[in-house]
């Protein structure tokens, strides 16, 4: 995984090629660095605006953050931060609307019903998807293409 500014800093390797489509999903690793939801969304906004400025014909898809499951206790820096994900996602949806880009809300596909927690059968470590999780993700993306 990467952080939002890591992606931003590598855009110079991608944007000169003017990709037809670009799928952006970033932010969960930034949560582990004690950043606020607002600061994470602000960095994603900078990234979106740079993509639109430097490659205006690229169709940009902004994906929601995926949930995680703290009960695995593998990623200590995410402890107590489960509820930040829907807060960030709500702001990302507004960001997408304001910038006239497609927002793909993946979050509800991956959560335990009635919670903000990643379904246990879709992960082996509480953060990263397993094969079953990737199948759900691919299916969701194909619906939007």
Could you say what each language-model-derived stretch is?
Residues 8-145:
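Alpha-helical cap/lid subdomain in secreted, periplasmic
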Residues 1-3:
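A short beta-strand-loop structural module common to alpha/beta enzyme folds
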